[in-house]
């Protein structure tokens, strides 16, 4: 979607967001009292809009893909039987 299709509340540096490694999501406080959220996988796919699930506000996340945490390798979590 183009910028015209979004009503962006603000731009937020990813360093100002909180990362939850268990959920693999970034969050940032929303003025409504909830949190803007965006998944690590979405950021890695080039998406940069975090949304608040409680209101209509959205923020643009400023980040470099190369600086994101690496997603856990699904194959690495599978035990290999001998």
From Swiss-Prot:
GO terms for biological process: protein histidyl modification to diphthamide; tRNA wobble base 5-methoxycarbonylmethyl-2-thiouridinylation. Residues 8-64 form the DPH-type MB domain. SUPFAM superfamilies: CSL zinc finger (SSF144217). The gene is dph-3. Component of the 2-(3-amino-3-carboxypropyl)histidine synthase complex composed of dph-1, dph-2, dph-3 and a NADH-dependent reductase, predominantly cbr-1. It catalyses: [3Fe-4S](1+)-[protein] + Fe(2+)-[Dph3] = [3Fe-4S](0)-[protein] + Fe(3+)-[Dph3]; 2 [3Fe-4S](0)-[protein] + 2 Fe(2+)-[Dph3] + NADH = 2 [4Fe-4S](1+)-[protein] + 2 [Dph3] + NAD(+) + H(+). It is found in: Cytoplasm; Nucleus. The lineage of its organism: Eukaryota, Fungi, Dikarya, Ascomycota, Pezizomycotina. Signal peptide: none annotated. GO terms for molecular function: ferrous iron binding; iron chaperone activity; oxidoreductase activity. Pfam families: Zn_ribbon_CSL. Fe cation binds at residues 30, 32, 52, 55. Pathway: Protein modification; peptidyl-diphthamide biosynthesis. Belongs to the DPH3 family. GO terms for cellular component: cytoplasm; nucleus. Its cofactor is Fe(2+). It comes from Neurospora crassa (strain ATCC 24698 / 74-OR23-1A / CBS 708.71 / DSM 1257 / FGSC 987). This is Diphthamide biosynthesis protein 3. Transmembrane segments: none annotated. Required for the first step of diphthamide biosynthesis, a post-translational modification of histidine which occurs in elongation factor 2. Dph-1 and dph-2 transfer a 3-amino-3-carboxypropyl (ACP) group from S-adenosyl-L-methionine (SAM) to a histidine residue, the reaction is assisted by a reduction system comprising dph-3 and a NADH-dependent reductase, predominantly cbr-1. Acts as an electron donor to reduce the Fe-S cluster in dph1-dph2 keeping the [4Fe-4S] clusters in the active and reduced state. The DPH-type metal-binding (MB) domain can also bind zinc. However, iron is the physiological binding partner as zinc binding impairs the protein electron donor function. It comes from the Eukaryota. Keywords: Cytoplasm, Iron, Metal-binding, Nucleus, Oxidoreductase.
